[in-house]
Structures are given as structure tokens and as C-alpha cells.
Amino acid sequence: MNYDIFAVGNVSDDTLSLLTVTSMETAVDAGNAQVQIVHAASMAPTVDIYVTAPDTDITTEQPLVTAEFTDATDLIQVPAGDYQIRITPAGETTVVYDSGTVNLADGADLLIAATNNVGTGDSPVTLLAADGDGSFKIWDAEAGAAIRVVHGLSLIHI
């Protein structure tokens, strides 16, 4: 049995709590990737999560999952390959998060959590992916970059 623990909620409004997500230890079938999805974004509503081939029109697709805050899926196996992860408010097709193309490698075993976006861009969430050895963020493809320029030399004028 695997146990993953998230701190969710917000310190400022006293909603901070622990969320324990469990899963059975399951081998990934050859040619597949395995994911477990967690809605850990306290400031996001109930959402539909689409995991499709890149550039697929989601208006003709069913979401992989509909999730409200603190929901977690079971382990889901999908064929290894390139995907696009898009999140919409539940029942709508207006995309509020778009991963762009993401490769789910053969044998990958990922826990992917939607977390509150504290970076750039308008998306309410970013995705945090963990594979047991480390973690990385999957930013919204439309987020852009934040740049801060500091002039710290007093003898040089710009």
C-alpha cells in the first residue's frame, strides 16, 4: 500500500489540513504509463480533467475524470505516448488549464496533483507530478514566464 500525504487548504483562513491519498502497489503493464490524479487545489471548483491526444477537440470527448477538491482517482493505466491534459470547470468546455504536449513514458508511474497556482498566468492550477524519485511542475502552456530585473550597482547608470 502506498500513502501520499498533501497539505491542502489555506493557512490564512484556517482551512489547512492533511489529505492522505492511498493506492495499492501495482506494476505498470508493458507499453503503458500509470497515473493517479488528485484534486489538491483548494481555490479551484469541481473540474473535468481531459487527458487526450494533443490538439484533440474536447467538445467531442468525455472527461477522464470529474473531481472536486480532495478527490483522488484510483491508479489509471494509459498507453505510453504524448498527451495533452486540459482542465475545465465541471460540465463546461472552457479550458482553464492546458499542459500542452506531455509525454507519459513507457513504465512511468506518476502521482499528478492539481495544486493552487501561485506562479504566473491566469490558470487557477498548476500540476505537480511525482514519480517516487522526485517531483516536477507541469505549468499551464499559456502561463509565460515571470522576469524581474534588478539594477544593484550604484556606480553604473542605466
Label the predicted regions.
Residues 1-156:
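Intrinsically disordered, low-complexity polar regions and short flexible loop motifs
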